Design a protein with these regions (language model features):
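General detector of N-terminal leader/presequence modules that precede the first folded domain
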Residues: 1-64
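Hydrophobic residues embedded in beta-strands of well-ordered beta-sheets
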Residues: 45-46, 79, 139
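Broad, structure-driven detector of short, well-ordered beta-strand segments within folded domains
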Residues: 38-39, 70-72
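Cys/His-clustered metal-coordination modules, chiefly Zn-binding fingers
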Residues: 85-156
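Short acidic-glycine loop/turn motifs at beta-strand connectors
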Residues: 42-43, 73-77
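A generic structural signal for well-ordered coil/turn residues at beta-strand boundaries
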Residues: 42, 66, 119-121
Length: 156
């Protein structure tokens, strides 16, 4: 997919809370009520794109520190993150990618819940090489039935 990513599809960079407020105001009320696709680029900055965007496109085809979906709520005159996940089947980020998300949000002055509100555990099956989601702590490949490794193994 990376070769097909055009530079104009990269997500909106959010350096400050005002950047977020402007971008969300451009989205409209119904779209702003949905979660958005996000990545934290290698420069540590948050990038946002509409929910149905591919994470790889949001990142401009580059590697990332974190990826997932993020939802916002407005309260006390400002936008805050009320839900955030590492749900990205393109990048399959590990749970420790939260640290990059928190740093990007803190840097921009955007309040957040302090963790992923919904965590997804990804692993690559060493036997069949498929990407799998670990459900309910069951580290078994849904494709071939082999045991999945306990440590994250989906680095680019």
């Amino acid at each position: 997919m990376r070769p097909t990513v055009r530079p104009d599809t990269a997500g909106r960079i959010v350096r400050a809370a005002d950047d977020l407020a402007v971008w969300l105001s451009e989205r409209g009320q119904s779209e702003s009520a949905e979660p958005f696709t996000f990545v934290v680029a290698l420069d540590g900055l948050l990038r946002l794109a509409p929910r149905r965007s591919e994470h790889v496109a949001c990142a401009g085809g580059d590697d990332v520190l974190a990826a997932g979906e993020m939802g916002f709520r407005r309260g006390s005159g400002r936008w805050t993150v009320h839900e955030v996940t590492n749900q990205s089947t393109g990048y399959c980020p590990d749970l420790d990618s939260w640290h990059a998300v928190a740093r990007a949000l803190d840097r921009a002055g955007i309040d957040h819940p302090g963790r992923f509100t919904h965590e997804i555990v990804f692993r690559r099956c060493e036997r069949c090489q498929e990407r799998s989601v670990v459900r309910e702590g069951d580290f078994v490949c849904v494709f071939c039935g082999s045991a999945l490794p306990s440590a994250w193994n989906l680095a680019p």
